[in-house]
Amino acid sequence: MAASNWGLIMNIVNSIVGVSVLTMPFCFQQCGILLGTLLLMLCTWMAHHSCMFLVKSASVSKRRTYAGLAFHAYGKVGKMMVETSMIGLMLGTCIAFYVVIGDLGSSFFARLFGLEVSEGFRVFLLFSVSLCIVLPLSLQRNMMAFIQSFSAMALMFYTVFMFVIVLSSFKHGLFSGQWLKHVSYIRWEGVFRCIPIYGMSFACQSQVLPTYDSLDDPSVKIMSSIFALSLNVVTTFYITVGFFGYVSFPETIAGNVLVNFPSNLVTEMIRVGFMMSVAVGFPMMILPCRQALNTLLFEQQQKDGTFTAGGYMPPLRFKILTLVVVFGTMLGGILIPNVETILGLTGATMGSLICLICPALIYKKIHKKGLASQFILGVGLLILVISTYTTLTVTEEPTQIKSELLERIDLKEEKDPEQINSQKSDEKAKVEQPGDNRDKPKLPPKNPEEEQIKGPIEGPQKEKDTKKQEEVQLDRPDQGDIAVPVGEAHRHEPPIPQDEVAVDEKKDQGEREEKKESVVDINSTEKKDKQQINLEKEPEIKDQAEANKGINEPVPQKPPQEVNDPNKQQLVNPPTPRLKEQPPFKDLEGIIKDLAVPVEIKKNAEIAEEKDNNDFANPVKAIENPPIKDEKNEQIPGDPGKESHVEPKAEDNQAEAGKAELLDHAFLLQVIKEQQVQQKRLLDQQEKLLEVIKEQHMEIHQQKGDEDQQDKLEGNIADKNKEELKAEARVAQKPLEGDKLENVGEVNAKVDKPAVEEHVVVVEKEQNPALNQVVKGNVPDVKKNDHKIEAPKINVEEVKVPISAGKHKKQSVQENLIHQQDVDQGASDNYKQREKAVAANKDYVLGHIIQQETANPIDPITLPDLQDKLGKLALHQTEPKQKPVKIAGIGEKKLGAVQEEKILVQKGQEAQADKVIQDNYNPVPDHGLHENNNADAPATINVEAKKEHIEKPKDGAVLEHDEGKQNRDLKLQNDMDLRRKKRDLALVQQENNGAQIISFHPVPNLKVNDLRGALEARLNQMVDGGLQVVQSRKIKQLIDEEKNR
């Protein structure tokens, strides 16, 4: 063989080998190694015979073109069929070239310029390549020298590409033998899909006759040897690339094998080189396609039946055809994004016609013989029908694989082949190769985790747990308090903080199910607790509304900072109840218990003076109005769960009704912060209250010693008027200190149905210290006979500003208003007598004074010096805090007499005050009871009713008996400290044998049989005459300022 023939061989090899080489590993995977090799050899044999059919037919018919042979054999029909098939084959090949350029070039240039691989970028790249590279080369008329040099470069590149594939197989375990278990050897399902690709891979029939015409000595034998050698080289190349590429990626082979390779310098060079070889090879495909179009459309038949030579075309026609072919194939490359589809479809139709069917038909027509031609014709027709159908039905699968591969190349991931295989229905179980395991250890557990994250969970479970821990561990005003989120406010156990890292929390399915059940339980308890809170609020609102009509039985309670609501304890179990059992100051325990106030009275007192709630400068207001707006919202420092549960109900009751379960974490944190601010404020207020109580306690003990000494000096004075004046002085001396503790204490009593619905006189307690003295009167059943009231027993402890009380039978409000004027007149008449009686009760010397009053009635003015001295002191101390008295329900004009006497006291007119005391003294007002009773005025308590029954205050039995009854009244409050204080009180009183006159402990209960009228006359009116006493089984005062507003 001459040396010139190698140039022809290189041209034939370059014309055969094209983009089909990239699909060889894919064909081996579809058919298996053995079956794919056999089919490749079969296609090589058929390609060789088809080429020889054309050479032999050309030598016999003296024709040198493919179309001329078809016209010689079958006329115009054959000529048109051949030309159409040739045009389709060339266009399909150009489309495949564009697809390869888009696949390889888009990823490379995107990384080079830092862009993202997208469809728009791919379109832009194809348009740029066709406009800048393909079109200039295709417009040249004489390209034979360029084509030969390009063929040499292409063959060198294909050789390098083959060695890269072989080395890649070494890297992926070729010698380890692992691939033997994963590759397929015979797979019949992919036969009809691979045969068209194989047939297209040997499509060199268009180059046969030009090569035969270019020989110096044309002969069939030389052409046979040249094509045999060329096809053997191509077959070897195809088998090498297919086998080693399949071994490298046995489970995940794309139509373009270069897509499977990881991104590195070598593979990028291979991709760019292959892309450039394809781009430069366009003119080799466009040249025959353009000539075929010219002869098909513009060639004219001559008179002798032949056609004019189609070698020359006018410039305009040449340019138009070139533009149509270039940009038409570019549009096809954009619409068909995968190379194996276009190659399979083109090979099954045009390839089978050009390579197999037409040569066999021409040879059979001209030579009239040939068994081989019939076999090749049958195979060609079979491929045309079956392979076309098979290629069209499986078009979508490679498209999905290729699009995913492009995304993986974008992200520079080497683990994408495993994800591609998951979309193939006919593949075996996925097995990872050793080289790919480094970057994929975490892929398998991600899918089950994502399936478990469902429902209201907004983010990963781990992230949510960390947010919950942050919520629980927020800063708090007190270390013992735990701020719980709204969603967990109803838990019946304190939340357990978890700082450790949760291990295997997501892997254990059982734990996840338990968590779901616990969430359902918490939601159910939330709904139940909301209903309980609503049920608790309704009776409290009703009790507050009916507070002016009937006063319920009082239950002894602790001060506001120690309020213990059993209903709230059922909902929340406070983790650290520090203030529940012991008060902050142990020695103040007895005083705090003496200040016990019923819940209803405390509420009304707070409503009456809500404007002064924040005035902590005045200790009296600070104790009267603790910084608690409502008992339902009252927070205990040791009970954070209660805080977080009640505050949202008070503020966002309607909002939480439908959204309590859908609050996001940001809202929970905001609610917790607001609760913490409120809790800090409450704690600061309570600290101030405790400081005030401590100061008052110290002042009381200091004052107690001074009063004891003063009582000893004046103990021998038997004059009743002296004692009364001295009592008045004490009433004026101790208001400033006494109010602070005693103005909070209310009269603990219960009205069955008051005779008159009292027009309650609301007094700002710090304004009139004389009215703030407390006397608790426990009046048992008071029965009314026809003409007198029986008072079998009156337990006098402390009375808060005695006020006229009504009858104890049920009467309507209209009847009460009718007799109101009589009550006012009685109040003005008995003003001074009640003033003296209250002063005596406050100093706890009631019994001693009454005894001396009964035995030694002396003229009121016997010691003017002492009287003046004490009167000045009293008026001086009471004057600074005197303010106008607010009266509810009674007009100010009706109390004119009472106000005149109050003004006399406030202005400090000593002489007038003394004169009033002297003139209004009435020692025996026995008829007062009948006068008030006949006038239907409220029955009043008279201190003189105790004259006979207080003559024996030293009797220990009476003390013990009354003390025992008092303890029975306190059974509702399970407080051991209170019982201990009461027992100590009884022992101290027995030891002193009743000699102690001034004491801060309650005076023993004293029995009274009669002298009811005297008792009512003495206590009928007070200094201001503004407050009223409701007489029933027990005495209780209700202050409600809301009615005045």
UniProtKB/Swiss-Prot annotation:
<feature type="transmembrane region" description="Helical">
    <location>
        <begin position="269"/>
        <end position="289"/>
    </location>
</feature>
<feature type="transmembrane region" description="Helical">
    <location>
        <begin position="117"/>
        <end position="137"/>
    </location>
</feature>
<feature type="compositionally biased region" description="Polar residues">
    <location>
        <begin position="564"/>
        <end position="573"/>
    </location>
</feature>
<keyword id="KW-0915">Sodium</keyword>
<keyword id="KW-1133">Transmembrane helix</keyword>
<dbReference type="GO" id="GO:0003333">
    <property type="term" value="P:amino acid transmembrane transport"/>
</dbReference>
<feature type="transmembrane region" description="Helical">
    <location>
        <begin position="33"/>
        <end position="53"/>
    </location>
</feature>
<dbReference type="GO" id="GO:0015179">
    <property type="term" value="F:L-amino acid transmembrane transporter activity"/>
</dbReference>
<keyword id="KW-0406">Ion transport</keyword>
<feature type="transmembrane region" description="Helical">
    <location>
        <begin position="85"/>
        <end position="105"/>
    </location>
</feature>
<feature type="transmembrane region" description="Helical">
    <location>
        <begin position="375"/>
        <end position="395"/>
    </location>
</feature>
<feature type="compositionally biased region" description="Basic and acidic residues">
    <location>
        <begin position="460"/>
        <end position="479"/>
    </location>
</feature>
<feature type="compositionally biased region" description="Basic and acidic residues">
    <location>
        <begin position="503"/>
        <end position="546"/>
    </location>
</feature>
<feature type="region of interest" description="Disordered">
    <location>
        <begin position="606"/>
        <end position="658"/>
    </location>
</feature>
<dbReference type="GO" id="GO:0006814">
    <property type="term" value="P:sodium ion transport"/>
</dbReference>
<keyword id="KW-0812">Transmembrane</keyword>
<feature type="transmembrane region" description="Helical">
    <location>
        <begin position="150"/>
        <end position="170"/>
    </location>
</feature>
<feature type="transmembrane region" description="Helical">
    <location>
        <begin position="320"/>
        <end position="340"/>
    </location>
</feature>
<keyword id="KW-0739">Sodium transport</keyword>
<feature type="transmembrane region" description="Helical">
    <location>
        <begin position="342"/>
        <end position="362"/>
    </location>
</feature>
<dbReference type="GO" id="GO:0016020">
    <property type="term" value="C:membrane"/>
</dbReference>
<feature type="compositionally biased region" description="Basic and acidic residues">
    <location>
        <begin position="627"/>
        <end position="658"/>
    </location>
</feature>
<feature type="compositionally biased region" description="Basic and acidic residues">
    <location>
        <begin position="412"/>
        <end position="453"/>
    </location>
</feature>
<feature type="transmembrane region" description="Helical">
    <location>
        <begin position="8"/>
        <end position="28"/>
    </location>
</feature>
<protein>
    <recommendedName>
        <fullName>Putative sodium-coupled neutral amino acid transporter 10</fullName>
    </recommendedName>
</protein>
<comment type="similarity">
    <text>Belongs to the amino acid/polyamine transporter 2 family.</text>
</comment>
<dbReference type="Pfam" id="PF01490">
    <property type="entry name" value="Aa_trans"/>
</dbReference>
<dbReference type="InterPro" id="IPR013057">
    <property type="entry name" value="AA_transpt_TM"/>
</dbReference>
<keyword id="KW-0029">Amino-acid transport</keyword>
<keyword id="KW-0472">Membrane</keyword>
<feature type="region of interest" description="Disordered">
    <location>
        <begin position="412"/>
        <end position="584"/>
    </location>
</feature>
<feature type="transmembrane region" description="Helical">
    <location>
        <begin position="226"/>
        <end position="246"/>
    </location>
</feature>
<keyword id="KW-0813">Transport</keyword>
<comment type="function">
    <text>Putative sodium-dependent amino acid/proton antiporter.</text>
</comment>
